From Swiss-Prot:
The gene is phmD. Belongs to the Diels-Alderase family. Its EC number is 5.5.1.-. It is an enzyme of class 5 (isomerase). Pfam families: DA_C, DA_N. This is Diels-Alderase phmD. It comes from Phaeosphaeria nodorum (strain SN15 / ATCC MYA-4574 / FGSC 10173) (Glume blotch fungus).
Length: 358
């Protein structure tokens, strides 16, 4: 870890490997995440895993390496654990990339093929063992919707905060044992990479995430609210039909010429979280005026998948969900979705903004 003020390598997109570390070495503010999530075909079970290289929690005495594991069951019970590895290895080979986060008592790994079509996550800990495998139903993408490789695309989604999606949407197979209980199912999966020059608390006021698998359609949306640009929205969406990209946009302003989309939170459903934002679902509209194409998707939460509380009613709630939709005037499809709604507090006793324009 660099403690000097000298510049470090910091990836900004282009042809950089999506899976490789995005900063070398770590410094005092920049952090990154490899994130995997999934929802079962009955929309009742879910998981989310996070692999981190991030100094922003070192003040808690836990170091710069972290792995988080969360699962949800149909009866509303949830399991969560966080481990702090002593070692981290990223191996880049011709076949793909392997990541290892380990200590004497546990081991977490992921493997992503070079074409980013397949992924496998494995873990061996005192409480959790098993494997999650994914087969992509989409294509790796940048925030601007272009698919990898794209030399002129940037990974910067908003000021000082970056994302790419190696696997926007996938079919997932889960075969795990948690506290001696089998946790095995098939469903929706996905993977994204998130990194920033500063902490999430510095860069973001909020975030909305949607991942959909319905019939031939695979959809991924991330929308960020900037803290540095005080409330400005930075949305990004991509839709795939039988694995081929058919729509992408960062524009939410209605137009007679340019492709655009809208996402609206709904509050008339039955399943919500414990935070101030009682969202129960989403409505999505994707419009391509030039091609005279229009898709709609209606999402209704089925179960609370995970939740983290940041104080004063803020934090993040993730849900497994049902979805119904497709192209207007054509066959409509039922499927499954994962959503997340995140709001950061305006102030925190633990974290201070790391960015200043002065």
């Amino acid at each position: 870890m660099s403690k000097s003020k000298d510049p470090i390598f910091f990836s900004t997109g282009g042809l950089d490997n999506f899976i490789s570390p995005k900063m070398r070495p770590l410094n005092g503010t920049a952090g990154e995440q490899w994130e995997f999530d999934g929802v079962s075909d009955d929309a009742k079970l879910a998981f989310v895993f996070g692999f981190y290289r991030d100094p922003n929690y070192a003040i808690l005495g836990s170091g710069n390496l972290r792995v988080s594991v969360e699962m949800a069951w149909p009866n509303g019970s949830r399991f969560a654990q966080v481990d702090y590895p002593t070692d981290n290895i990223i191996e880049e080979c011709d076949w793909g990339t392997r990541g290892i986060w380990r200590s004497n008592d546990f081991n977490y790994t992921f493997e992503i093929t070079a074409d980013m079509k397949r992924a496998r996550v494995g873990m061996h800990t005192p409480q959790v063992t098993g494997i999650v495998s994914m087969t992509s139903t989409s294509q790796p993408r940048y925030p601007d919707g272009r698919t990898y490789p794209s030399e002129n695309s940037t990974s910067e989604a908003l000021p000082y905060f970056h994302f790419v999606e190696p696997i926007p949407v996938a079919r997932a197979h889960v075969d795990m044992t948690i506290l001696g209980e089998k946790f095995a199912w098939d469903g929706l999966g996905g993977m994204e990479r998130l990194w920033g020059a500063f902490s999430w608390f510095t860069c973001l006021q909020g975030m909305n995430v949607i991942r959909i698998l319905a019939g031939p359609y695979s959809l991924s949306m991330l929308s960020f609210t900037s803290n540095i640009k005080k409330g400005r929205e930075y949305p990004s969406i991509a839709l795939f039909d039988n694995g081929e990209p058919v729509f992408s946009s960062q524009n939410t302003e209605e137009s007679d010429v340019n492709d655009y989309f809208s996402f609206t939170k709904t509050y008339d459903g039955k399943v919500t979280g414990t935070l101030r934002d009682k969202v129960t679902g989403y409505e999505l509209e994707l419009v391509s005026p030039g091609r005279q194409l229009h898709w709609t998707f209606l999402i209704d939460h089925a179960n609370l998948a995970f939740e983290y509380i940041l104080g004063r009613g803020t934090g993040g709630s993730g849900f497994s969900a049902w979805v119904n939709g497709g192209r207007m005037g054509r066959e409509q499809f039922k499927g499954i979705a994962l959503t997340e709604a995140l709001t950061f507090p305006k102030k925190s006793p633990l974290f201070r903004p790391q960015y200043s324009e002065d």
